[in-house]
Amino acid sequence: MKVGIVGNGMIVPIAIEAMLRAEIKVTALWCRNEAKGKPIVEKYQIQNQYTDYQAFLNDDSFDTVYIGLTNALHYQYAKDAILAGKHVIVEKPFTVTLAEAKELQELAIKHECMLFEAILSRYSKNYEHLKDELIKIGKIKLIQANFSKYSSRYDEFRKGTITPTFDKAHGGGALMDLNVYNIHFVVGLFGLPKKVQYYPNLAENGVDTSGILIMEYPDFQAVCTAAKDSTSDPFVIIQAEDGTIVYPERPGYVRYGERYDRLTNLTEEIDIVVEEDPMKNEFLYIQEIIDTKNTEQMNAWLEKSTMTVTVLEQALQSILQG
């Protein structure tokens, strides 16, 4: 796998460094503003830089496009890349509407391209192992997930400067940027809920700076909290009749966990694989799926991405419905 990068946002250098740690070559960068892209090109010695997206897609030095743009742009740039015959890795959220998600999945299948959403928990062996741990705690009753982090852009926003991360037109807000991690964590394990209700704190421009999402399942409730206007320790807690599982980290990471057994009154560490570099693992796993042409796994993941976008869309609709 050789990668061409799209964008120059905060996530891009982080992703490039993870790729380099995974010994994945980055050969090109597209950025609308050449001056903003130049420092990235120089720092990581990327051989080709473009401001014309079609010229970028015509570059045969890479086979995979990584899209690190604002949320609302994911769909169109991913679509164009697939139509150009490139594999695509899209940062979360996959898309901002369900129709967009379904179209991208159909296009990837039609054009025999591999398509992925970059969401860390999905590529964690420990997350997969969690499914075995759930059996040990009995009937699930409550799930709580929290990812609250004061945004580096929030001070500007409070002064009246609207950046994409706090702009509804760009798919910004706490639901799309942070609560998506919580939703992925829950939906990846339990599928679609039967009901979704979102209770946001809305700013004057209508964007949600924080909020609580409730997902109702047949036998339990999942409460997902996210904030870009305040900070608290992240966690995931899964409460069941015979025990409780706790992960004291953001839902994207599954690196340490404890399981409490109500019947024995004992708490044990969950047996996990040491994953000190989740993003490196993510790209290595994606590379493996591309190299082995494992479309079955790709499609299974895309179904989960589509489910997550379904929840996001229903959450936004629930605000309008009151």
Model-inferred region functions:
Residues 1-44:
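N-terminal Rossmann-like dinucleotide-binding module
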Residues 5, 15, 44, 48-107:
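Beta-loop-alpha module in the N-terminal Rossmann-like domain of NAD(P)-dependent dehydrogenases
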Residues 64-66, 285-322:
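C-terminal helix-rich "cap/oligomerization" subdomain common to oxidoreductases
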Residues 90, 115-117, 247:
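Hydrophobic residues in well-ordered beta-strands that form the structural core
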Residues 103-120, 141-142:
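Rossmann-fold dehydrogenase core element
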Residues 121-193, 322:
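Predominantly a Rossmann-like dinucleotide-binding segment in NAD(P)-dependent oxidoreductases
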Residues 183-253, 284-289:
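Contiguous beta-strand/loop segments that form the cofactor/metal-binding neighborhood of enzyme cores
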